[in-house]
């Protein structure tokens, strides 16, 4: 079941948090920056992965924290190539492909709940009315609660329905 909530995704009790990024992203804004600051080991491992594997847009990369929670980075944006270059914009086909991979990952790892923000609708400029149907299509049949943090409220813990 998919639920739209207001609150701070960092207070979510979900077993996995997903976010949209670019391959080689520097995590300088929004949720990515907050995760980079709270989990520097995740960011270090992400950078190493990108430098050694050269991931493509439309894929995912996951990381498990010490408390057993997954952070799943969805490559929704065009990559940042070259030192100091900025990531490109998000594209709907990248969002769709990465959500499909996320669905497969959730089933494979038996993840019991997922939280994600309004993917690719912040700095990257996609229209939520085009992104939300992709989430419904790719994640709607999962038999777990999926929490979309549609309205960010810093420091506010949302009430997450169990299903």
PLM regions: where:
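Macrodomain-like recognition of ADP-ribose-binding/processing modules
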Residues: 1-163
